[in-house]
């Protein structure tokens, strides 16, 4: 069985006096795709932000058996965790290529340019737009850039927050196909927050259902996607 790469235990997260996550616990195993599902307001984005050191938390977050609960966001990136936020989060005034270079801020090796070329090979449209500002790209192109920029840090774990949000179905399909390739061919472990339950579970190994800041269901993705009661009750089916 694969090793546990990321583990959250009794994790709470708050914005000021408002507690959003109420002691949740979950695991992500090495080389798997795990998804967190739930309706708007369930706490999905807060979960990803908590793992990235962006909100106040209690409980324990371990990555490769090391406690990262109190680390700042940039230190978490240096440990091997990259975050693609909801809404793309590119630097709109920078060019496509400069955005990619920003993604490699923790690196000092000689492979950065090769990795930029790999991003262009994965998404040829980014090569075509490499001298344009990120703000001039379409929504789908910005999402491709956001994912590529995160990969420039060579993460072991990629956190993706609502990657399908606001995108045309054909763009979403292409993105998720690329996620599968990244996982199967390159061994990138992923934790994906999604509202599109059928799409996410269709590519995942493991799923968690979040409701009102608590994990109410967890299990193999295949079992969740085939459980009509779960789909109806929690996933909008």
Language-model features, listed with the residues they occupy:
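Glycine-rich phosphate-binding loops of nucleotide-dependent enzymes
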Residues: 2-237
């Amino acid at each position: 069985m694969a090793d546990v790469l990321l583990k959250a235990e009794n994790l709470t997260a708050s914005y000021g006096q408002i507690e959003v996550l109420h002691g949740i616990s979950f695991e992500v195993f090495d080389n798997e795709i795990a998804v967190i599902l739930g309706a708007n307001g369930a706490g999905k984005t807060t979960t990803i932000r908590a793992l990235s050191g962006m909100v106040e938390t209690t409980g324990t977050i371990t990555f490769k058996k090391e406690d990262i609960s109190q680390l700042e966001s940039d230190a978490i990136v240096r440990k091997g965790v990259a975050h693609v936020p909801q809404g793309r989060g590119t630097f709109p005034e920078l060019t496509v290529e400069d955005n990619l270079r920003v993604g490699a801020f923790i690196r000092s090796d000689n492979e950065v340019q090769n990795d930029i070329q790999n991003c262009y090979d994965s998404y040829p449209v980014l090569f075509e737009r490499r001298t344009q500002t990120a703000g001039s790209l379409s929504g789908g192109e910005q999402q491709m850039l956001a994912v590529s920029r995160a990969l420039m840090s060579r993460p072991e774990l990629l956190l993706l927050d609502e990657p399908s949000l606001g995108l045309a179905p054909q763009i979403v399909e292409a993105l998720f196909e690329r996620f599968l390739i990244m996982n199967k061919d390159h061994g990138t472990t992923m934790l994906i927050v999604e509202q599109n339950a059928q799409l996410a579970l269709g590519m995942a190994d493991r799923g968690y259902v979040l409701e009102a800041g608590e994990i109410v269901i967890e299990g193999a993705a295949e079992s969740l996607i085939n459980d009509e009661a779960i789909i109806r009750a929690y996933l909008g089916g």
